[in-house]
Design a protein with these regions (language model features):
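A conserved FAD-binding loop/helix module that cradles the flavin
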Residues: 499-520
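A glycine-rich dinucleotide-binding beta-alpha-beta segment and adjacent secondary-structure elements
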Residues: 193-210, 374-385, 434, 438-502
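Helical element adjacent to the flavin cofactor pocket in flavoenzyme catalytic cores
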Residues: 222-271
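Rossmann-like flavin
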Residues: 99-213
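N-terminal glycine-rich phosphate/pyrophosphate-binding loop and immediately adjacent elements
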Residues: 2-147
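Mid-domain catalytic core of redox enzymes
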Residues: 262-395
Length: 524
């Protein structure tokens, strides 16, 4: 039997697994990353995925760089720019579009955004100016904790959060009301104009159902946008994963692709390595599972994982509301335009590089209600953009790629996806084409994936792109579940290192960085 030995084996070659490996290799550990697919990257990938358009680059999952700008440590500490990673800022990043073609722009400058709101309601603009300091105060309190291990004492982080709390002590009641209430309640309570309400519903709904309790934490998205801005990876999202892989090899780490893992080998509640489906075994003193916690625990040698712990991750919420985003990408023979929207604004602002948010307040609520019944709303709520507007290198000269992201689609439609896939794709494209002119006429080819496709292709439980749903009871040391968010698991030497642990989803490498720090404390 083919066998090799490492200090640490990383299961899963997504960007978190690669980041974890880089940090460990940088610390002098002998590391191997094992990936089931032909290329590394997981949900941080891009490439020519439409057969009819081999020169069009498709980003099948992640695209906008928000959390990477909030937590830029991976880029800086691992010197990824030296390995080819380049990002450019989008400003404005997000633009809400109302059915009557009115637009509301979320600028990076919150005062400028307030001025934009004043075009519709001076009262709402004033309400926005009063709300954002509360949001920023919460961000300032939360951010130090998001960047550290909840299993450690973190004196400096606690002090930073305490100082932020003291600085904003007069806003304590407002902060508590914000984060403990449904996001929708805050929107309805503070704002009156339908364009303003719809814009906020459309933005925050990307984090999940805005009518659920304690979803006021979704307002951090607004704080992040206006505090750190938005970016895009030039060349596509694969450049991030490729830069990490390049850095890992430079540090002496190994990468195996096309090698699905069959078992995380454990004896007497302590890992000894991994066994691949090919029959090869890899000995390791520690294993980082940069995959969904459910799959990780189920891979452990039968009888070795505590049944209670296994049950906790199996039942942890992953698209628990019955819905999930889907993705439709189109390769186009020309360029789409937003002339009608720009002309109605009349201020000369180009919207081509921005993400358009499509969906009224009523549509957002209806989409989330429909998914619970296994139905598709008549008016899909979606985010749409042309990545090639920011980066023309992702298509032949003068051509575009369209990225359509319906936010709330049923995980399992009543009719089944096989029966309605084409119908839904056409429905989404028809609706997007109302705002993205030329979309239908210029189509060369398309690709579409739903949550069950991601589950199959990426071994992603319930197709949940953030592994575990975002909520206050699944954050910090409670993520993925009570008793499992620390640096010790029921099987010694096993560490979780994906979006299912603190601080959660997003392309930022923070879970991988955290896992590496835990491994370094564990290994001699």
């Amino acid at each position: 039997m083919d066998q090799s030995s490492y200090d640490v084996a990383i299961v899963g070659g997504g960007h978190n697994g690669l980041a974890s490996a880089c940090y460990l290799a940088k610390a002098g550990k002998k590391v191997v990353v094992v990936e089931a697919l032909p290329q590394v990257g997981g949900m941080c990938t891009s490439g020519p995925l439409i057969p009819e358009a081999p020169n069009h680059t498709i980003n099948p999952c992640a695209l906008d760089l928000m959390s990477l700008r909030v937590h830029p440590m991976m880029i800086e500490e691992l010197e990824l720019e030296r390995h080819g990673f380049v990002q450019k800022e989008m400003n404005p990043g997000y633009v809400y579009v109302h059915p009557n073609k009115d637009t509301l722009v979320f600028f990076r400058d919150y005062e400028k955004t307030a001025d934009e709101i004043a075009r519709y309601s001076t009262k709402d603009a004033e309400a926005y100016r009063k709300l954002m300091p509360v949001v920023f105060a919460f961000v300032d309190m939360a951010l130090p904790q998001m960047r550290v291990d909840p299993a450690s004492f973190n004196f400096k982080a606690k002090l930073a959060s305490l100082l932020a709390l003291m600085k904003n002590s007069g806003r304590k009641d407002e902060i508590m009301a914000l984060v403990s209430s449904p996001a929708y309640t805050t929107i309805m309570e503070r704002f009156e104009h339908p364009v303003v309400r719809s814009a906020l519903c459309c933005l925050l709904g990307a984090a999940g159902p805005i009518t659920n309790e304690a979803t006021g934490i979704y307002f951090v998205l607004l704080g992040f946008i206006q505090k750190f801005g938005l970016g895009r990876a030039m060349g596509g999202m694969q450049t991030i994963s490729d830069a990490l892989a390049s850095r890992l090899r430079e540090l002496g780490g190994d990468i195996l692709v096309n090698e699905p893992v069959a078992e995380i080998v454990s004896k007497n509640k302590k890992v000894s390595g991994i066994r691949l489906k090919s029959g090869k075994t890899i000995s390791a003193a520690a294993v980082v599972a940069s995959i969904h916690p459910k799959q990780a625990f189920e891979m452990v040698t039968e009888g070795e994982m505590d049944r209670g712990a296994l049950t906790k991750v199996q039942l942890a919420p992953a698209n628990a509301h019955g819905g999930s985003p889907i993705k439709i990408d189109l390769a186009l023979s020309g360029q789409v335009n937003y002339h009608e929207l720009e002309e109605k604004r009349g201020d000369g602002l180009s919207l081509r590089k921005s993400v358009l948010l499509i969906g009224t307040e009523e549509a957002v609520l209806d989409n989330f209600k429909c998914v619970g019944r296994g139905q598709v709303s008549k008016h899909p709520y979606m985010w749409i953009t042309a990545p090639t507007a920011m980066d023309p290198s992702q298509a032949p000269k003068g051509q575009d790629v369209a990225y359509l992201y319906p936010v709330a689609m049923p995980l399992d439609p009543v009719e089944g996806w096989d029966a309605i896939r084409e119908q839904v794709a056409n429905q989404v494209i028809d609706w997007a084409a109302v705002y993205m002119k030329g979309l239908k006429e210029l189509e060369i080819g398309r690709c579409m994936e739903v949550a069950r496709d991601w589950e199959k292709r990426l071994n992603l439980h319930n197709g949940c792109v953030i592994h575990i749903d975002t909520c206050t009871t699944r954050s910090g040391g409670m993520r993925p579940a009570a008793g499992l968010g620390g640096d010790r698991l029921p099987v010694e030497g096993l560490f979780l290192g994906g979006a299912g642990i603190h601080p959660g989803g997003g392309v930022n490498g923070m879970p991988g960085r955290l896992a590496a720090a835990r491994v370094k404390r564990y290994l001699p």
